[in-house]
Each structure stands twice: as C-alpha cells, then as structure tokens.
Regions:
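Conserved catalytic core of the tyrosine transesterase superfamily
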Residues: 1-241
Length: 241
C-alpha cells in the first residue's frame, strides 16, 4: 500500500505516514471487533470506528482524514483483487449536535425541537423527524422517503438513498432516542398495513408528504414564537420589519 501511495498516487511522505498511521489505528480496532480479514470488513464496522473516534473527541478534520485513508486503502485492495467493493464509499459525518444554524438562535432551535408532545403517536413521529432532520441535514424529500430498514439504531446511522446512490449518515444520540421512541410507541399506532415499510407515516398509514411535513414544522415554529417563515426549501427567513 505504501508503494501504491508513493508510485501511483504520488503522495508526499507526510501524507503516506498519516495514511499508514490511520490504518494502523483502524486495523487495531477491527481486530478488537474480531474482524481479522479485510474482505470481512463492512460499512457497519467502519461506522463503528467513526463513532469510536468521535467518542475520543477527535476533530472532524481528523475523522475525515481517517475515512480518506480507509477509502484509499480499499481502492488499493480492489485494484489487487482482494475485495470487490469499497465499503468506505459515501460515508458521511454528522453535524455536531445542537450546532446553531446561522439564521436561528440556540434558544429558537431548542424551542422548535421541544414543541412536539411525545404523549401521542403524532408527537413521537414529529419529534423523530425534527431530530433526524436537524442531526443529519438531509433534504426533506429524503427524510420522508426513509424506510424502516434504513435505520440502524445500534450503530446510530441511517441509510439515505437518492436515485441509485446510497450513503450512510450518523444520527447521534438525540435522534437515535427519538427514533427509538417513535418505532416502539408511535409508528405502531399509525400503521394500517403491516407490510408498509415507509418509516414516517401520516394518519392514513401512508408516506408523509414533503408539503405535509413543512406545514407541521410551520405550526411548531409559530407555537414556539420563532419569527420568520418556514419555506418548502427548508430555510427560516428572518423578518427585518
């Protein structure tokens, strides 16, 4: 792999040393999981390593570099015929929890997320949707298109599919807890067809629409006393008058 980086990728010596150091840490973690063959490593294993780095309070830049190192290593292995695909492709990092959007204050964000009343199915659903949307930054169209099997609570990530492309996105503790409550207590009350796989359901047991979700968010924003208009594009436009 070192020769590949040096001769094919034309990487600098510092970059090579960083990649090798990252891979030593990654391989050590895999051994701890009992995964001793690179062909057995999957996306879930890599996500577990990402969370381990986050638990160690590593900087986002460090974690991104580790992912780049792992991704480059698996591309090398593909070229050598050792593996057939790269499990590190399309993995993304979550936003830091409770990071304040530029157009909303922390108090406003907290108020919005606290509006759903989790004493009923609707509130549990709305709470989960808001937490997932805020933690991941995915589009509303992607949010309402999620299916139950896109959620992995043990490793705290969702699989988001757009067209033929899928990516795995960590969700963090707050969103995980909200999803767990919704799946355990809320969705079972909304589902009409046992074979329905869509994650977020309306009262008719069908997939939530993008427009329906934004109407709900707008109502919560009004209840929270947040100035500005919630738009279908997901922005809060602050009024200046």
């Amino acid at each position: 792999f070192r020769m590949y980086l040096q001769n094919v990728k034309k990487s600098s010596e510092n970059t090579i040393l960083s990649y090798l150091r990252d891979l030593r840490g990654f391989c050590g973690f895999m051994e701890g999981l009992g995964v001793c063959e690179v062909s057995k490593i999957n996306r879930t294993n890599i996500m577990a390593y990402v969370y381990e780095l986050q638990n160690q309070h590593k900087a986002s830049t460090t974690i991104f570099r580790n992912l780049a190192s792992i991704r480059a290593f698996f591309y090398f292995l593909m070229g050598q015929g050792v593996v057939k695909e790269n499990p590190a492709v399309d993995l993304e990092l979550p936003r830091e929890e409770r990071k304040v959007p530029k157009i909303m204050t922390l108090e406003q964000v907290e108020k919005l997320l606290e509006q759903p009343k989790t004493s009923d199915a609707k509130g549990l659903r709305d709470k989960a949707m808001l937490e997932v949307l805020y933690a991941t930054g995915i589009r509303v169209s992607e949010l309402v298109s999620l299916h139950v099997d896109d959620v992995n609570l043990p490793f705290e990530y969702i699989r988001c599919t757009t067209g033929s492309k899928s990516r795995m996105i960590p969700i963090g503790t707050k969103a995980k807890e909200a999803l767990w409550e919704y799946l355990k207590k809320g969705r079972v009350q909304l589902i009409h067809n046992p074979e329905e796989t869509v994650l977020f359901l309306n009262y008719g047991g069908k997939k939530m629409t993008r427009q329906g979700f934004w109407k709900i968010v707008k109502n919560y924003a009004e209840e929270a006393g947040i100035p500005g208009e919630i738009t279908p594009h997901g922005r809060v436009i602050i009024r200046t008058s």
